[in-house]
């Protein structure tokens, strides 16, 4: 079980991801606004948000912005990572390839193409997932 200090850190990083997501307001429709923060050894090594419809999703932008290898890191993302091909490839694939060990998800994705499948794929590959944070 996590201690209060760890939970507070998780809340702070998720708050940062939510603030990043808001930067996409007015540009992402019909997609949702999403933010992501990657933390390794209590240091932010990458962050991103979905800037515009058709462009990189928040998870891929955060991974591209990493200042060091994300292997073993935690990702805080406001919405469940996608697991289907659309304008962008599945974000779950990028997360799996990156070596991230833990994903904290703010909300599950109600889109029927995702709807829990992204979380299930991550868990099936041994990634620790905290849902609906």
PLM-predicted stretches and their roles:
Residues 1, 18, 29-30, 39-40:
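Non-catalytic interface/targeting segments
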Residues 31-34, 71:
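Acidic, glycine-enriched active-site microenvironments
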Residues 9-29:
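Short, basic/aromatic recognition patches
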Residues 6-7, 23-27, 48-52, 56:
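Short, N-terminal intrinsically disordered low-complexity segments that are rich in Pro/Gly
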Residues 38-133:
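Zn2+-dependent cytidine deaminase-like catalytic core
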Residues 1-16, 126-129:
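Short, compositionally biased leader-like segments
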Residues 30-32, 58-59:
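Short N-terminal amphipathic alpha-helix/helix-capping patch enriched in small hydrophobics
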């Amino acid at each position: 079980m996590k201690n209060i200090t760890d939970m507070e850190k998780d809340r702070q990083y998720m708050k940062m991801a939510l603030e990043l997501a808001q930067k996409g307001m007015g540009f992402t429709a019909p997609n949702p606004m999403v933010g992501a923060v990657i933390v390794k050894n209590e240091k932010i090594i990458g962050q991103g948000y979905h800037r515009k419809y058709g462009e990189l999703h928040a998870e891929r932008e955060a991974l591209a912005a990493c200042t060091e290898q994300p292997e073993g890191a935690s990702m805080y993302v406001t919405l469940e990572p996608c697991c289907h091909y659309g304008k962008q490839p599945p974000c779950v694939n990028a997360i799996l390839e990156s070596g991230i060990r833990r994903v904290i998800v703010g909300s599950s994705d109600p889109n029927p193409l995702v709807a829990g499948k992204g979380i299930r794929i991550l868990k099936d590959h041994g990634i620790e997932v905290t849902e609906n944070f």
